[in-house]
Amino acid sequence: YKPLDQYSLKHRRIMTEINVQAPLDLIQQSLPFMFEANEGWIINLSSGSKRHPSGPPYDLGGVKGVYGFYGATKAMLDRLTTALASELADKHIRVNTVEPKAAVLSEGADAVVGDMLTSSQIESIEAMVESILFLAHCKPEHTGRNEISLDVIDQQNLTVMDLEGHEPHRGGKSS
């Protein structure tokens, strides 16, 4: 993450490739199998960084505009998701995005921002997994949505378990 004026063309292309082109490539390769089965589920991973900040003045928690390009790629992915949902609805293929409500502290994120976050700013990987599992089994009319993981869990009354299937685990760092 860095301000927009510090992104080289190479880094912009890499980020667009990872966050937009690669998911679309995988979707295009998977669609023939979904067409044959006459159903399918596509779940893209988005981010709250796609939202426009309110301002001025802009209170971005001290990060200024460092999420700008990353957020732009996630906004593009969300738009592709709703476009695909409208194109594929009659084929019983659900297409949704899900984003964490708080930061998911993957190993990579932990290395970059882990020391900057409190446990209240962290969502467990297990919570993301539970919301993704719901979207992988949702009804055909549940398509074209940009969901927020913890909201899905609350709306669907889901119980978040740890990755071994034990005691409920909702937020904070994974054990």
Which residue stretches match the model-derived regions?
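Conserved mid-core segment of classical short-chain dehydrogenase/reductases
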Residues: 1-13, 54-62
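A short helix-coil junction within the Rossmann-fold of NAD(P)-dependent oxidoreductases
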Residues: 2-3, 29-41, 52
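Catalytic Tyr-X3-Lys loop
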Residues: 5-25, 39, 43, 77
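Conserved catalytic Lys-bearing alpha helix of Rossmann-like short-chain dehydrogenase/reductases
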Residues: 20-23, 69, 73-81, 95, ...
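A short, exposed helix-loop element centered on a Lys and neighboring polar residues
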Residues: 27-28, 82
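Catalytic loop of short-chain dehydrogenase/reductase
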Residues: 41-76, 81-89, 102
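Conserved Rossmann-fold SDR core element
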Residues: 78, 82, 88-100, 140-147
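C-terminal helical subdomain
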Residues: 97, 115-175
